[in-house]
Amino acid sequence: MAGFMKRTMSYLGMSDVVPEDEDDEVIDEEPESSFDTDRSVTPIPAASTQPSTSQRKSVAPFHANINRITTIHPQSYEDAQLVGRALRDGIPVVLNLTDVSQSQAYRIIDFSSGVVFGISGSIERVTERVFLLSPARVDIVAEDTESGMSDNLFEN
């Protein structure tokens, strides 16, 4: 019955063609070593899930001491990397986009917004084309959210 299925599958193109003389031939191969019988590998004892008392260390809460804020005046989109590097290092950035065209400013804000999102930080608009970007560990307290600025980044 198995020979019939092999020939049918071969005829339909669903398997390799098997010559008739090789169909019933038994091939003697060396028995493969079983994984269970292979003793070349020695088991490693499982690590304890509970740390020993000597391994425990006290963890103090991290309180950021902000001693620097970077101001960046990009001249082109390539300068946006400076924003990413500063934020990655935990330094708040004041981003002044007054020296670039509006299309370049949109691209820089788009890149900077992605970086801020990636580090779980925040972005606040200070004026029409000046923004404060801060890492996650820096809290920004806005004085007046009803200052008359629209939700659009570049319009009043």
From Swiss-Prot:
Compositional bias per record (Acidic residues), positions renumbered to this chain: 18-35
Pfam families: SepF (PF04472)
Matching InterPro entries: Cell_div_SepF, Cell_div_SepF/SepF-rel, SepF-like_sf
Entry's localization field: Cytoplasm
GO biological process: division septum assembly; FtsZ-dependent cytokinesis
Compositional bias (Polar residues): 47-57
Family in the record: Belongs to the SepF family.
Function in brief: Cell division protein that is part of the divisome complex and is recruited early to the Z-ring. Probably stimulates Z-ring formation, perhaps through the cross-linking of FtsZ protofilaments. Its function overlaps with FtsA.
Designated name of the protein: Cell division protein SepF
Species whose genome carries this gene: Bifidobacterium animalis subsp. lactis (strain AD011)
Lineage of source species: Bacteria, Bacillati, Actinomycetota, Actinomycetes, Bifidobacteriales
